[in-house]
Amino acid sequence: MPQLRSRTVTHGRNMAGARALMRASGVASADIGKPIIAVANSFTEFVPGHTHLAPVGRIVSEAIQAAGAVPREFNTIAVDDGIAMGHGGMLYSLPSRDLIADSVEYMVEAHCADALICISNCDKITPGMLMAAMRLNIPTVFVSGGPMEAGKATLVDGTVRKLDLVNAISDAVDESISDEDILRIEENACPTCGSCSGMFTANSMNCLTEVLGLSLPGNGSVLATHTARKALYEDAGRTVVEITKRYYEQDDETVLPRSIGTRAAFDNAMALDIAMGGSTNTILHLLAAAEEAELAYDLDDINEVSRRVPCLSKVAPNVAPGGTYYMEDVHRAGGIPALLGELHRGGLLNEDVHSVHSDTLAEWLKNWDVRGGSPSPEAIELWHAAPGCVRSATAFSQSERWDTLDLDAAGGCIRDVEHAYSKDGGLAVLKGNLAVDGCVVKTAGVDESIWTFEGPAVVCESQDEAVDKILRKEIEPGDVVVIRYEGPRGGPGMQEMLYPTSFLKGRGLGKVCALVTDGRFSGGTSGLSIGHASPEAASGGTIALVEDGDRIRIDIPNRSIELLVDDAELATRREALNGVYAPKNRDRKVSAALRAYAAMATSADRGAVRDVSKLG
């Protein structure tokens, strides 16, 4: 029977000083000896996805206390990728993921916590906490801040338009849109607290924690503003105490993150990710989490899943034939359990999985899938939680309900396998001489007319150079924009390329150009945007050898990407570089913190994790 980790500080005469400090921080004498649950919050006023989380920590802590354990709350950092986008701040986004993982580890290990509950939400916070959970392998539950409501703007001509953050970025460079309309779009694109309203990185990852079995049903889709989310926080607090007692009092190791997050669970997570056309960043983060779990899982495994799973849902920034769906629409369609149910009925899930709330997948779907299960009235009520359509930065500020659910499996937000948007899933891994170790593309956001594409390269040594060329109208239809030295080492920090892709879209080039990079893309990216080229340029990848005018061929159906230059010429170019792989004429200030990250960073095919063996 495992002993409570906290016994190290709660028992024995020699630890009187530690207990004195615990009493000073508010722990009552009667509570010393109970399980200590670390409550990892991520409240910050910088990020709309986190600005409402201050009271959430208290709600979760009160539920933990009532269930018989001792909550101890602390905060991690949280970077807003949207605010950091388009300038040097984006260099810090991906490295913050690993810093968050470390900070959670430091707090849990330093204070001998017995279990962990992670209150996350936005782009790097959920992945960082997921890495920490897999690293620590103590009982853990995730509960996120929830999605933002979709925006709605009335334009000057009276047109009412539903929108999100990406519209505010791409429309800003569309010269046909007036300044007044741009202001209205800006003012209404992000109307509430919560993670941005589409299937961008934050919401993708929060949905995937459901499939990995580490969060409760509804975690990825209940809106941040809805009162139903408060009940979710309370349930999460109770659940983490339940699984903590199962582990320490019943020796039940099945509740540990590595027992839940098995290869089968990762396969199911990728199946859902591919079916819903999630952010390409999810691939990066799942690979990193698998590495922390000491689980052999790589791009080849992901590619195998992508070959058999169709695209069943298209949520912004992906556009469905009938219009654009948002996270509130996913929720109305039954949330992640409904999408899992469709995959299960299609024979596309591994059934040998469990979660923090259900012992089997069958139990999970029976209780929560509104399409094929037999959910309770309370579960059905959860899926009726609707947007309030009122600007608010406050959690639990509204309790609107949908009159009906979207159960249309043929033409609704979530389709069945028979009516899939495409037989190919929403994400794909490409390989070829330009990316020997692989690269990724969000096929759900690519017009099928350009799934095969060939064009001349326009080489950019940085994201900034690419933006300048796009805005100066130097990019022509048919071009392949190549942005290199933006990988984990080369950036350093592997910047997101939302501005270049959004500006291509705003210039009307989104369906007639391609973009290839060793950097990465925002979950809000659409178009033929291929990222994570590995090895990256700074590690001597072929992308470092590309020259202006070289032809590049992209073939999504056959999962290939080729630089149409013969091997002898590439060898000559490599010899000319003389082992120096660095950008030309790039003026960029790189801090000591970023240099430290770059010294250990691996390429994207390994999740851009740090390899401490590089330290010697």
Swiss-Prot record:
It catalyses: (2R)-2,3-dihydroxy-3-methylbutanoate = 3-methyl-2-oxobutanoate + H2O; (2R,3R)-2,3-dihydroxy-3-methylpentanoate = (S)-3-methyl-2-oxopentanoate + H2O. [2Fe-2S] cluster binds at residues 122, 196. Keywords: 2Fe-2S, Amino-acid biosynthesis, Branched-chain amino acid biosynthesis, Iron, Iron-sulfur, Lyase, Magnesium, Metal-binding. InterPro entries: Dihydro-acid_dehy_C (IPR042096), DihydroxyA_deHydtase (IPR004404), DiOHA_6PGluconate_deHydtase_CS (IPR020558), ILV_EDD_C (IPR056740), ILV_EDD_N (IPR000581), IlvD/EDD_N (IPR037237). Gene3D superfamilies: IlvD/EDD C-terminal domain-like. Pfam families: ILV_EDD_C (PF24877), ILVD_EDD_N (PF00920). The keyword Nucleotide-binding does not apply. This is Dihydroxy-acid dehydratase. It comes from Streptomyces griseus subsp. griseus (strain JCM 4626 / CBS 651.72 / NBRC 13350 / KCC S-0626 / ISP 5235).
